[in-house]
Regions:
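Core beta-strand elements of the Rossmann-like FAD/NAD(P) dinucleotide-binding domain
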Residues: 144-153, 157
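Short beta->alpha hinge that forms the Motif I/post-I loop of the SAM-binding pocket
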Residues: 29, 42, 160
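Active-site-adjacent segment of FAD-dependent monooxygenases/related oxidoreductases
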Residues: 36-113, 130
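Helix N-cap at the beta1-alpha1 junction of Rossmann-like dinucleotide-binding domains, i.e.
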Residues: 31-33
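N-terminal Rossmann-like FAD-binding beta1-loop-alpha1 element of flavoenzymes
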Residues: 1-26
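A conserved short coil-to-beta-strand element within the FAD-binding core of flavoproteins
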Residues: 122-137
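Flavin (primarily FAD) binding-site architecture
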Residues: 156-170
Length: 180
C-alpha cells in the first residue's frame, strides 16, 4: 500500500492501514513537519481514531476546546456558524478542539516511525502513476532520480493541490483563500 502525503491525514491513514496488517510506503515531496498550520481543528469522531494510537489525550492537552465555529467566504461573508457545548460529546471526547498542525504532526510521526510495517520516503515527489489492473505503478522523483514502485493500492493524502486528485480528474470546491 502506498500513501502520497505525510501530513496529518496521510500519517494517520498509514497508521490505520499498518494496523490492518498492510505494509505501507508513505511518500512526501517535502521533509519534516509542515512549517505552517493549514489544518487547525479536529472533533470527537477523529479523536476516537487518535485514541486508537494513544494520541487523543496528548492532543487534547495541547489544544483548546472551542464553542463556536464560523465559516466564511474570502470576502468574510458568512457561510455557516455552528454553536456547540464545551466539554465531552456523547462519544466521550470534546466536540471541537483547535491544535497547532506542526505539533500534532510531530505527535503522529513519533508513532508512525515506531511501526515496522511503515516505510517513509521524504523528498520523494510523486510524478506519475498508472493503473496496471491488479497493482499501481508509482513513479517518483527523488534527488533528480526517477524511482518506480509497484503497489496494490495508492491513497492520495497530498492536500489541496493534490497531484493524485488532479490526475484522476476529481473536482475540488475552492473557496479562494490565500494560503500564504
Amino acid at each position: 500500500m502506498a500513501i502520497c502525503g505525510y501530513g496529518p491525514v496521510g500519517s494517520l491513514c498509514s497508521l490505520l492501514m499498518a494496523d490492518y496488517g498492510y505494509k505501507v510506503l508513505l511518500i512526501d515531496k517535502n521533509i519534516g513537519t509542515s512549517p505552517t498550520a493549514r489544518a487547525i481543528n479536529t472533533d470527537g469522531e477523529q479523536l476516537r481514531i487518535f485514541d486508537k494510537f494513544g494520541l487523543a489525550e496528548k492532543i487534547i492537552e495541547n489544544s483548546n476546546q472551542i464553542e463556536k465555529i464560523h465559516f466564511s467566504k474570502k470576502s468574510l461573508e458568512p457561510i455557516q456558524s455552528i454553536t456547540q457545548t464545551l466539554g465531552d460529546s456523547s462519544m466521550g471526547w470534546p466536540n471541537q478542539v483547535l491544535f497547532y498542525q506542526p505539533e500534532l504532526e510531530g505527535f503522529v510521526r513519533e508513532v508512525v516511525e515506531s511501526k515496522e510495517n511503515i516505510d517513509v520516503m521524504e523528498l520523494c515527489e510523486l510524478t506519475d502513476f498508472n493503473d496496471k489492473g491488479n497493482e499501481v505503478e508509482i513513479i517518483c522523483k527523488n534527488k533528480n532520480k526517477e524511482i518506480k514502485f509497484l503497489s496494490k493500492f495508492l491513497i492520495g493524502c497530498d492536500g489541496a493541490s493534490s497531484f493524485v486528485r488532479k490526475k484522476l480528474n476529481i473536482d475540488l470546491d475552492d473557496f479562494g483563500y490565500n494560503q500564504k
